[in-house]
């Protein structure tokens, strides 16, 4: 395939008997036509206590995937991935990345420029160093609450797959709002300690929490289905 293709992020609630097999064996490119990559994780509520039902929601599943084109997504949802059609997903084009993952090796650092005022989707994916998990939680939970409570984040959540994989997913009203949050500047007068994210990133540079860590930025194309009883998470300015 030439070019980055189309990405999706799916959210669905299923019985544990369905989610556990998907966590162990997500959809595979050799079994799903025009699928390039897929990863399934259990949802977590950002900022939830470490030991709590909200921290590991085995019935609520996220899937991050890369496809050849939108026709491949439709074929998957109409066929082998029909259970995902009962949930919610957003279709996205890749804009840029910071760092890289072995699972997504050939993406360019920047595919397209973005407008500061356009809506944006951010996905992080990391493989944890297990001895660093307590330290990661100490620095990470304040950032989780910052993103969760930010007035410009229309949807924000985290997901995990034992033992090492962790992801965050967020939709923002604008690129500017997201980058201001990342750097702890501007537009956050109503939030306590807006520099939490910048401080955590400085700590990660001092001693990394992860074997691998990458941040991806996407332009939302279209939104499908319902999550938690609602739709419309992608701001209307995205020209949906």
Residue ranges, per PLM feature:
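Active-site pocket scaffolds in enzymes
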Residues: 200-204, 211-212
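Conserved CoA-thioester-binding segment of acyl-CoA-metabolizing enzymes
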Residues: 81
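Short S/T/G/P-rich N-terminal loop/turn motif that feeds into the first structured element of a domain
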Residues: 1-61, 68-76, 85-162, 177-191, ...
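Acidic/histidine-enriched, beta-strand-rich ligand/metal-binding domains
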Residues: 162, 197-200
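Outer-membrane beta-barrel domain signature
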Residues: 84, 190-192, 196, 203
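Alpha-helical membrane segments in multi-pass integral membrane proteins
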Residues: 159, 167-169
